[in-house]
C-alpha cells in the first residue's frame, strides 16, 4: 500500500493521526467487525470558517503589527558560502545528508536547556543561528521554522494542513555568550508563538519585500525539530514502521531537521544541489556538532571563541596546509613564468578588479604592447621605470610590460602627495613614468 498525499491537505501531525486511526481500525476489520471511529467535534471546513472570522479587525492588526515590528529591516538574504553561483531563478534540485549526534551530547543539550529554562528547540535553534552567523559573517540571522498550528483541542484529531511557518530572528553578536543568545532566542520564540496565527504569506505581504526569483522571501534556511515522529505500530499481525526515502528536491537553500532516536538526536540536512556540494554540507554538519560540544561545555563563553574546527581540521589548517615549500625555476624571470602560464591557459582568468578583468592571454598581449612601446622610448635592460598606478588590471599590465622590456619598475603609490611623488621620481632617475590617464599631473 502506497499512500501519497499533497501537502495542501495534510501535514506531519496528520500522518500520525492517520496511523493511529489505522491501528485502531485494522484489527477490528481483520476480526470481521465493523470498524468505526468516534465522531469528530468539528471538520476542517469548520476550522477554516472560524479562522477567517477570528483573524480580522483588531486581532488581525495586532498580529500584523507584531511581525512588521519584529522583522523591520531584516536582511532579505543569508549569504552562505556556496560552491556555485546562485542561479537567476531558484531551482528545486536537492539531496539529503543524515548525521547522528552522540547520545551523550544529546543528553548534555537537554540538560543545558533545562538549566537555562529553555526548550530543546530553543537551544538547538540558538546554536544553529550561531553557526549560520559564523558561516555567513552576518549578525542579523532570520531562520524559518514550522509550527503545528493546533492550538485548539478540537483540531488535534483532524487531518488537514494546519502548519504555519514562523520567521525567527536573532542578533548574533560574536561578543555574546551562548547563554545570552539563548535568552534572546527564547524571548523571540515566545513572542512568535503568541502571534503564530497570521499565515506566513500574509507576513511577507505585510513587509512588502522586493521580489527576487533567485531565492525564497525573508529566509532561505529552515530549521525543524520533530517532536512527533511517525511511530512503529503493531496491529492485526502487521508491523508498520517509517521508511526513510532519499529526496531529490529542496524547498530552501538549506533545511536542517532534528529528531529524537534511541541513540540521540539525528540531524537530516536537506540542501539545494545547485548551490552546495555534499562535502560542503557534511563539513557544516560536523561544525554544528563541534559547536554544540563547545557551547554545552562552556555556555558562558563568547560565541566567537567557540571553535568550529575538530582537532583533525585544526591540524590540517595549522600544519598540513602550512607546508607551502615548493621547488620552482630559480633562474627563470617571473615574466617568463607568466608567459608559460599564459601559453598553458590563455583563456583562464588572470586578474579581476572592480573595473574589469582579463584572461592570461589578454594580459600577456597587453603587456607585450607596453614592452614594445617602452623599448621605442629607449628603455634598456636594468633601466628604471616609475610605475604609479591604482590597484587595477592596468597595474598588472604595467609591471609585466616593464619586466618584458628589460627594465626594473619603481612602484610609487598615487595616494602620496604630489610633491613627494615628484621627488621620489626624480631620485629614481627613471627614464619613463608609466601611469594612468586620470592620475596625470
Annotate each predicted stretch with a short phrase.
Residues 1-43, 64, 69, 80-82, ...:
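Carrier-protein-dependent adenylate-forming modules in NRPS/ANL systems
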Residues 78-80, 97-101, 170:
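Generic detection of short hydrophobic beta-strand segments and adjacent strand-loop junctions
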Amino acid at each position: 500500500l502506497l499512500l501519497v498525499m499533497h501537502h495542501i491537505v495534510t501535514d506531519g501531525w496528520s500522518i500520525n493521526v492517520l496511523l493511529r486511526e489505522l491501528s485502531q481500525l485494522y484489527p477490528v476489520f481483520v476480526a470481521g467487525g465493523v470498524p468505526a471511529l468516534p465522531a469528530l467535534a468539528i471538520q476542517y471546513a469548520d476550522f477554516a470558517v472560524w479562522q477567517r472570522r477570528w483573524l480580522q479587525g483588531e486581532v488581525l492588526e495586532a498580529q500584523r503589527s507584531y511581525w512588521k515590528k519584529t522583522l523591520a529591516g531584516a536582511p532579505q538574504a543569508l549569504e552562505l558560502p556556496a560552491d556555485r553561483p546562485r542561479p537567476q531563478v531558484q531551482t528545486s534540485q536537492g539531496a539529503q545528508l543524515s548525521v547522528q549526534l552522540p547520545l551523550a551530547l544529546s543528553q548534555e543539550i537537554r540538560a543545558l536547556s533545562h538549566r537555562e529554562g529553555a526548550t530543546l528547540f530553543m537551544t538547538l535553534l540558538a546554536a544553529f543561528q550561531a553557526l549560520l552567523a559564523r558561516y555567513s559573517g552576518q549578525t542579523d540571522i532570520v531562520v524559518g521554522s514550522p509550527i503545528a498550528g493546533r492550538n485548539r483541542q478540537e483540531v488535534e484529531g483532524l487531518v488537514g494542513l494546519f502548519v504555519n511557518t514562523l520567521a525567527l530572528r536573532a542578533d548574533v553578536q560574536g561578543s555574546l555568550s551562548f547563554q545570552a543568545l539563548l535568552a534572546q532566542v527564547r524571548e523571540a520564540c515566545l513572542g512568535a508563538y503568541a502571534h503564530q496565527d497570521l499565515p506566513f504569506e500574509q507576513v511577507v505581504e505585510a513587509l512588502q519585500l522586493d521580489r527576487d526569483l533567485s531565492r525564497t522571501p525573508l529566509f532561505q534556511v529552515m530549521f525543524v525539530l520533530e517532536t512527533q515522529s511517525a511511530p512503529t505500530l503493531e496491529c492485526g499481525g502487521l508491523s508498520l514502521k517509517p521508511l526513510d526515502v532519499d529526496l531529490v528536491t529542496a524547498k530552501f537553500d538549506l533545511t536542517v531537521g532534528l529528531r529524537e532516536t534511541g541513540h540521540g538526536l539525528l540531524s537530516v540536512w536537506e540542501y539545494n544541489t545547485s548551490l552546495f556540494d555534499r562535502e560542503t554540507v557534511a563539513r557544516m554538519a560536523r561544525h554544528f556538532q563541534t559547536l554544540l560540544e563547545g557551547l554545552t561545555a562552556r555556555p558562558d563563553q563568547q560565541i566567537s571563541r567557540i571553535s568550529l574546527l575538530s582537532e583533525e581540521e585544526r591540524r590540517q589548517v595549522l600544519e598540513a596546509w602550512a607546508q607551502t615549500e615548493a621547488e620552482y625555476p630559480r633562474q627563470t624571470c617571473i615574466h617568463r613564468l607568466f608567459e608559460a602560464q599564459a601559453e598553458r591557459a590563455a583563456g583562464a582568468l588572470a586578474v579581476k578588479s572592480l573595473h574589469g578583468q582579463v584572461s592570461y592571454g589578454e594580459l600577456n598581449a597587453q603587456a607585450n604592447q607596453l614592452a614594445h612601446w617602452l623599448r621605442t622610448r629607449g628603455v634598456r635592460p636594468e633601466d628604471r621605470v616609475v610605475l604609479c598606478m591604482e590597484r587595477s588590471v592596468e597595474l598588472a599590465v604595467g609591471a609585466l610590460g616593464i619586466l618584458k622590456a628589460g627594465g626594473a619598475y619603481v612602484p610609487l603609490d598615487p595616494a602620496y602627495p604630489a610633491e613627494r611623488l615628484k621627488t621620489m621620481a626624480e631620485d629614481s632617475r627613471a627614464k619613463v613614468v608609466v601611469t594612468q590617464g586620470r592620475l596625470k599631473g
